[in-house]
């Protein structure tokens, strides 16, 4: 894979994931107790022996830069790297990134310097495990100009994706972005041609683009230069290229989740606790997911009842109930608490005992979850200070609310407590 250069698209402002993206880029959003979203595509690259990786981003990239710099340091005997390329204004390009294709176009001067055969374009907000070597080999074996990774999907969700029609060789013959009604029906394909059983094909009669592409080097350069007004791969570049280029497909029939919204992010995290078999597992020695080593002590559980949950490193839990939840590193939960169907991201630091004691004596709220608090169907961002006898339960069943001044939002019926928020004692949300 020495002839492959990976380009991970960090995405835009992350408005669908707000407020989790208020102070961080979308790829830097914490995941599964100890990881960040960017760790997924980068780990897939490393496990696929692709070690030349750029990450393109333009919003709130400080924490992403810090995470990548601390995590992905290849040895001095390797030429591998993972490097962030932030949007910048130049005399030739006075605007910020206008879309996925425009982001790559603005850095063509750098990307084209690499003597590679293929560019691998990836997204920074998907949860999946893929061996990109199989993807690139499919591209090479079919003499393709462009290859798209596609996913068989059922009709209920098909209109949320860019859909493809293909011939029996797997070549793309038509492309439609998020079709509805009759246009959706016309995009049905026989997925048994891709190895699905008749029963699976009947359930999943559509092929959806995953937003993951392999381009021949010169093909990508030519397409971006010939169409300077085209800013998006899925909506413009790929449909245009399908008319006169060999655009092939690679079927990925495994777990894949676009976690670009609060609802999908919440569900994907809690699905990791599902028994007996979660849809995605971080416990795979052959293809591990890497992240920054923190050298934290083991978690300490004092008289706790924990059911179907994931507890990160360095947590301190006292006489509490944890049910179907994910707790991030350094989470602290006091006695009498109930954490139910919740995602707690933990903390960036430990608060010394003397400081905690001083805050409690002065009726202030220390870091963590205070005694006798209930957190149900919620996301609590890092470094939140939740007081005693607080109830975060969305008691009025609100779907959407902006209470930023009070330290929380409600998105899709899920309460999201902001990073560094302080929720006073006896608050009911």
UniProtKB/Swiss-Prot annotation:
UniProt similarity note: Belongs to the bacterial/plant glucose-1-phosphate adenylyltransferase family.
Gene Ontology molecular functions: ATP binding; glucose-1-phosphate adenylyltransferase activity; structural constituent of carboxysome shell
One GO term describing the cellular component: carboxysome
Gene3D superfamilies: Hexapeptide repeat proteins, Spore Coat Polysaccharide Biosynthesis Protein SpsA, Chain A
Enzyme class: transferase
PROSITE patterns in the record: ADP_GLC_PYROPHOSPH_1, ADP_GLC_PYROPHOSPH_2, ADP_GLC_PYROPHOSPH_3
Subunit structure: Homotetramer.
Binding site for alpha-D-glucose 1-phosphate: 162, 177-178, 209
Keyword terms, alphabetized: ATP-binding, Carbohydrate metabolism, Glycogen biosynthesis, Glycogen metabolism, Nucleotide-binding, Nucleotidyltransferase, Transferase
GO biological process: glycogen biosynthetic process
Function: Involved in the biosynthesis of ADP-glucose, a building block required for the elongation reactions to produce glycogen. Catalyzes the reaction between ATP and alpha-D-glucose 1-phosphate (G1P) to produce pyrophosphate and ADP-Glc.
Annotated source species: Cyanothece sp. (strain PCC 7425 / ATCC 29141)
Pathway named in the protein's UniProt entry: Glycan biosynthesis; glycogen biosynthesis
Protein name: Glucose-1-phosphate adenylyltransferase
This enzyme's EC code(s): 2.7.7.27
Cross-referenced Pfam families: LbH_GLGC, NTP_transferase
The keyword Ribonucleoprotein appears for this protein: no
Swiss-Prot/TrEMBL catalytic activity: alpha-D-glucose 1-phosphate + ATP + H(+) = ADP-alpha-D-glucose + diphosphate
InterPro entries: ADP-Glc_PPase, ADP_Glu_pyroP_CS, GlgC_bac, NTP_transferase_dom, Nucleotide-diphossugar_trans, Trimer_LpxA-like_sf
């Amino acid at each position: 894979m020495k002839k492959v250069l990976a380009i991970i698209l960090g995405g835009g402002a992350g408005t669908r994931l707000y407020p989790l993206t208020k102070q961080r880029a979308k790829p830097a959003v914490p995941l599964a107790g100890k990881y960040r979203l960017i760790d997924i595509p980068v780990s897939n690259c490393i496990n696929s022996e692709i070690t030349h990786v750029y990450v393109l981003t333009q919003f709130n990239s400080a924490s992403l830069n810090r995470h990548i710099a601390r995590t992905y340091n290849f040895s001095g005997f390797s030429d591998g790297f993972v490097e962030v390329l932030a949007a910048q204004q130049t005399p030739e390009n006075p605007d910020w990134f206008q879309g996925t294709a425009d982001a790559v176009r603005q850095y063509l001067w750098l990307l084209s310097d690499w003597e590679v055969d293929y560019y691998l374009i990836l997204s920074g907000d998907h949860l999946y495990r893929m061996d990109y070597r199989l993807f690139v080999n499919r591209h090479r074996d079919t003499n393709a100009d462009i290859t798209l990774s596609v996913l068989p999907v059922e009709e209920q969700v098909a209109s949320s994706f860019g859909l493809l029609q293909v011939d029996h060789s797997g070549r793309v013959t038509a492309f439609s972005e998020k079709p509805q009604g009759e246009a959706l029906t016309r995009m049905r394909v026989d997925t048994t041609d891709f190895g699905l059983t008749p029963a699976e094909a009947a359930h999943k009669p559509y092929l959806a683009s995953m937003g993951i592409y392999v381009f021949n080097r010169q093909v990508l350069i030519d397409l971006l230069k010939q169409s300077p007004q085209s800013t998006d791969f899925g909506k413009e570049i790929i449909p245009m290229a399908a008319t006169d280029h060999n655009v092939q497909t690679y079927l990925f029939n495994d777990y894949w989740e676009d976690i670009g919204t609060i609802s999908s992010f919440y569900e994907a995290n809690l699905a990791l606790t599902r028994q007996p078999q979660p849809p995605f597992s971080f416990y795979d020695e052959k293809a591990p997911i890497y992240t920054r080593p923190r050298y934290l002590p083991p978690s300490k559980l004092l008289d706790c009842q924990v059911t179907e949950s994931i507890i990160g490193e360095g947590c301190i839990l006292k006489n509490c109930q944890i049910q179907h939840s994910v707790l991030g590193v350094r989470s602290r939960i006091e006695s009498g608490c109930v954490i139910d169907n919740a995602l707690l991201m933990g903390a960036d630091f430990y608060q010394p005992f003397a400081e905690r004691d001083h805050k409690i004596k002065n009726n202030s709220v220390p870091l963590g979850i205070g005694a006798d608090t209930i957190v149900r169907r919620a996301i609590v961002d890092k470094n939140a200070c939740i007081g005693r006898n607080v109830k975060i339960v969305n008691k009025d069943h609100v779907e959407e609310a902006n209470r930023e001044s009070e330290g929380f939002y409600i998105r899709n019926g899920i309460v999201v407590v902001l990073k560094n928020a302080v929720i006073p004692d006896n608050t009911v949300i």
